[in-house]
């Protein structure tokens, strides 16, 4: 597809929503013979995660400024200039043919440094509302890509979906097994858990189990295991519940589930679509610009999900939605198919193709 020896600098960090899609593209290009290098920050998750995938990573010193104190904001311009110079040094040493920015603090200085060096800059925005870094960089980027329609209003952007792991794409293509009598509910609140799910699910399951057999696989987050387990026991529901601080094998969890209760992060929404699972979405209420609500609307408008704002969520509403899905397995299956229908399954290849094209143009 492309001559071996091409080089790409990938900039993504801070959260899994940035890092994992970037890793999907990096792995794909590495398989094509590309040399991949990463730019990130030393105190965020990319510092630990990226080397595990065999990629070299360089660090620059940059932190976010949005919502911080006055002194930090006054110092920010000087820190930004320093971080741009740090990124410039990395670029001068590595000499990438193209730079890919997928969000996180390092993307801003790295993107500016790339354009100052005359290197093509590709941006990819995972959320339905762009983050501040990508919003600013979109004005100077060579090509802007996004996962959802109407993400950018001031620049022309190509909609390509969110890159996700090939294992999940393959899972979505598998025939769905016959539904068990028990409704299987997967609860995922992120690596830290979601307090609202941990607080409400034990009682909601108790209410639901009066009418319906139900089993639960609940990711409760770090340090929450004992408290949530006790809550399920208090409501007499510990028998059909699998509780874990963190679910390492999401492929197995998605394969097991009939329905997913979760937040509406961009990567989560894209994964639900790819694996073809119906969902109850509770957007994180403190997300910047309420972007999770916009993310979730993609599945809601397709008829593949229910969206419940956390401000109005209570035990009875949650139990009621689960009961509704349990009572109509045919509609549950249709919701799963609608989710799969809106999935963009070649997002990784599309992002890679843009990078390849720009690198070949020089």
Swiss-Prot record:
Q: Which NCBIfam families match?
A: murG
Question: What membrane topology was assigned to this protein in its record?
Answer: Peripheral membrane protein
- Name the pathway: Cell wall biogenesis; peptidoglycan biosynthesis
Question: What GO molecular functions are on record for this protein?
Answer: UDP-N-acetyl-D-glucosamine:N-acetylmuramoyl-L-alanyl-D-glutamyl-meso-2,6-diaminopimelyl-D-alanyl-D-alanine-diphosphoundecaprenol 4-beta-N-acetylglucosaminlytransferase activity; undecaprenyldiphospho-muramoylpentapeptide beta-N-acetylglucosaminyltransferase activity
Q: Which SUPFAM superfamilies match?
A: UDP-Glycosyltransferase/glycogen phosphorylase
Superkingdom of origin: Bacteria
Enzyme Commission number(s) of this protein: 2.4.1.227
Tell me what gene encodes this. Answer: murG
One GO biological process term: peptidoglycan biosynthetic process
Q: Which UniProt keywords apply?
A: Cell cycle, Cell division, Cell inner membrane, Cell membrane, Cell shape, Cell wall biogenesis/degradation, Glycosyltransferase, Membrane, Peptidoglycan synthesis, Transferase
**GO CC, alphabetical:** plasma membrane
> Which named protein is this?
UDP-N-acetylglucosamine--N-acetylmuramyl-(pentapeptide) pyrophosphoryl-undecaprenol N-acetylglucosamine transferase
Summarize the protein's role: Cell wall formation. Catalyzes the transfer of a GlcNAc subunit on undecaprenyl-pyrophosphoryl-MurNAc-pentapeptide (lipid intermediate I) to form undecaprenyl-pyrophosphoryl-MurNAc-(pentapeptide)GlcNAc (lipid intermediate II).
Q: Does the record carry GTP-binding as a key word?
A: no
Reaction(s) catalysed by this chain, per the record, are: di-trans,octa-cis-undecaprenyl diphospho-N-acetyl-alpha-D-muramoyl-L-alanyl-D-glutamyl-meso-2,6-diaminopimeloyl-D-alanyl-D-alanine + UDP-N-acetyl-alpha-D-glucosamine = di-trans,octa-cis-undecaprenyl diphospho-[N-acetyl-alpha-D-glucosaminyl-(1->4)]-N-acetyl-alpha-D-muramoyl-L-alanyl-D-glutamyl-meso-2,6-diaminopimeloyl-D-alanyl-D-alanine + UDP + H(+)
Q: Which organism is it from?
A: Shewanella baltica (strain OS223)
Where does it reside? Answer: Cell inner membrane
* Positions contributing to UDP-N-acetyl-alpha-D-glucosamine binding: 15-17, 127, 165, 191, 247, 266-271, 292
Q: Which InterPro entries match?
A: GlcNAc_MurG (IPR006009), Glyco_trans_28_C (IPR007235), GlycoTrans_28_N (IPR004276)
Question: Do you know which PANTHER family this protein is assigned to?
Answer: GLYCOSYLTRANSFERASE, UDP-N-ACETYLGLUCOSAMINE--N-ACETYLMURAMYL-(PENTAPEPTIDE) PYROPHOSPHORYL-UNDECAPRENOL N-ACETYLGLUCOSAMINE TRANSFERASE 1
Q: Which Pfam families match?
A: Glyco_tran_28_C, Glyco_transf_28
The top EC class is transferase
The entry's family comment says: Belongs to the glycosyltransferase 28 family. MurG subfamily.
């Amino acid at each position: 597809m492309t001559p071996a020896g091409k080089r790409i600098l990938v900039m993504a960090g801070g959260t899994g929503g940035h890092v994992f899609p970037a890793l999907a593209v990096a792995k794909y290009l590495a398989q094509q013979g590309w040399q991949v290098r990463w730019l990130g920050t030393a105190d965020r998750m990319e510092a630990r995660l990226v080397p595990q995938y065999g990629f070299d990573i360089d660090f620059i010193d940059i932190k976010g400024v949005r919502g911080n104190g006055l002194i930090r904001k006054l110092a920010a311009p000087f820190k930004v200039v320093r971080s741009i110079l740090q990124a410039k040094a990395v670029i001068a040493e590595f000499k990438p043919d193209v730079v890919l920015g997928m969000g996180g603090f390092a993307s801003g200085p790295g993107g500016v440094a790339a354009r100052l060096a005359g290197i093509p800059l590709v941006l990819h925005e995972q959320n339905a509302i762009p983050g501040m870094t990508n919003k600013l960089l979109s004005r100077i980027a060579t090509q802007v890509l996004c996962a959802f329609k109407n993400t950018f209003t001031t620049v022309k952007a190509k909609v390509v979906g969110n890159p996700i792991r090939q294992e999940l794409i393959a899972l979505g293509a598998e025939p769905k097994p016959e539904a068990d009598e028990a409704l299987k509910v997967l609860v995922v609140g992120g690596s830290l858990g979601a307090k609202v799910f941990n607080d409400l699910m034990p009682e909601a399951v108790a209410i639901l189990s009066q009418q319906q057999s139900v089993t639960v696989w609940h990711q409760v987050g770090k340090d929450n295991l004992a408290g949530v387990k006790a809550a399920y026991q208090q409501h007499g529901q510990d028998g059909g519940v699998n509780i874990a601080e963190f679910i390492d094998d999401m492929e197995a969890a998605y394969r097991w589930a009939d329905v997913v209760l979760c937040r509406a992060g961009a990567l989560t929404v894209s994964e639900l679509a790819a694996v073809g699972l119906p969902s109850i979405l509770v957007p994180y209420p403190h997300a910047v610009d309420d972007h999770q609500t916009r993310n979730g609307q993609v599945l809601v408008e397709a008829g593949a999900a229910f969206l419940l704002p956390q401000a109005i969520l209570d035990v009875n509403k949650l139990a009621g939605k689960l009961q509704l899905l349990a009572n109509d397995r045919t509609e549950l299956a249709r919701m799963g198919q609608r989710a799969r229908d809106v999935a963009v399954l070649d997002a990784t290849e599309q992002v890679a193709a843009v990078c390849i094209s720009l690198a070949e143009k020089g």
